[in-house]
């Protein structure tokens, strides 16, 4: 799906670094996992439920076949105790966490009037609370080394709005604010925190959601004028590699738009 993207970083840019990628087995997360592995990172994929393990295993197989390192852990990031548990397990098994990529997220298209407390609470739990609790856990591990990187995957829609996405966009707007606030507070620890504002990416789930929404509303999806073709997961992966590598050692508290021009269109 989409165009082919070539890795542009040295194969040792992330050598021996343990990089946790939530939702790293599907969609955008799979592109992030592959790009991190291609740069030498030891990829740790977090998947939410047993039925998703097959997708994580597929990405792991691809990475290992290419000579990389990857493993997977089960965790529902929408549950605080699960976030604490999984980071503790990873640190026990790997010795440390060098970088965390809070990529896992959900987005169910629902009209504002139809958003129930359950829908609202689940989006906040997965898209905002999960990154908060995971970040708390990894920062405790990173502080003694005075080095580490956290990247949150947010969206350009947090600054533009969007139909039937009030719950999703609100949670991602909170994630952007979490990014800048964390970066400010823990700057002296040597841990950097940045976010990527993601544009439209051609993933299986995204394409299906657009098709379902068109069927539901009876209106075709219209991309914003001036926006380049939809991105591919590896576009986000390259940006992540930059933000967790030494190439960005002077970058923290930044909200980086990787969107093909959507934010300015």
Where are the regions a protein language model picked out?
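Alpha-helical segment proximal to the catalytic Tyr-Lys
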Residues: 140, 184-188, 249
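Short C-terminal tail/terminal secondary-structure segment
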Residues: 2-9, 160, 241, 252-265
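Substrate-binding pocket helix/loop in short-chain dehydrogenase/reductase
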Residues: 97, 111-112, 116-124, 217, ...
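Residue(s) in the substrate-gating loop at a strand-loop-helix junction
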Residues: 155
């Amino acid at each position: 799906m989409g165009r082919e993207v070539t890795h542009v970083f040295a194969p040792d840019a992330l050598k021996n670094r343990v990089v946790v990628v939530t939702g790293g087995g599907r969609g955008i997360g799979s592109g992030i996992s592959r790009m991190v592995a291609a740069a030498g990172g030891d990829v740790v994929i977090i998947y939410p439920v047993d039925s998703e393990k097959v997708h994580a295993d597929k990405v792991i197989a691809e990475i290992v076949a290419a000579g990389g390192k990857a493993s997977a852990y089960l965790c529902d990031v929408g549950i605080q105790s699960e976030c604490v548990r999984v980071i503790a397990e990873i640190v026990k098994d790997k010795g440390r966490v060098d970088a965390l990529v809070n990529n896992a997220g959900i987005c169910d298209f629902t009209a504002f009037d139809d958003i129930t407390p359950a829908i609202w609470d689940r989006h906040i739990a997965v898209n905002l609370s999960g990154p908060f609790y995971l970040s708390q856990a990894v920062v405790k591990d990173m502080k003694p080394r005075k080095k580490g990187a956290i990247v949150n995957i947010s969206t350009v829609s947090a600054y533009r709005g969007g139909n039937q996405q009030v719950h999703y966009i609100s949670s991602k707007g909170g994630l952007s604010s979490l990014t800048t606030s964390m970066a400010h507070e823990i700057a002296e620890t040597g841990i950097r925190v940045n976010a990527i504002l993601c544009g439209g990416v051609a993933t299986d789930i995204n394409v299906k959601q657009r098709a379902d929404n068109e069927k539901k509303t009876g209106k075709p999806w219209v991309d914003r004028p001036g926006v380049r073709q939809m991105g591919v997961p590896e576009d986000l992966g390259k940006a992540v590699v930059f933000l967790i590598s030494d190439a960005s050692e002077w970058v923290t508290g930044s909200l980086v738009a990787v969107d093909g021009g959507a934010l300015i269109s």
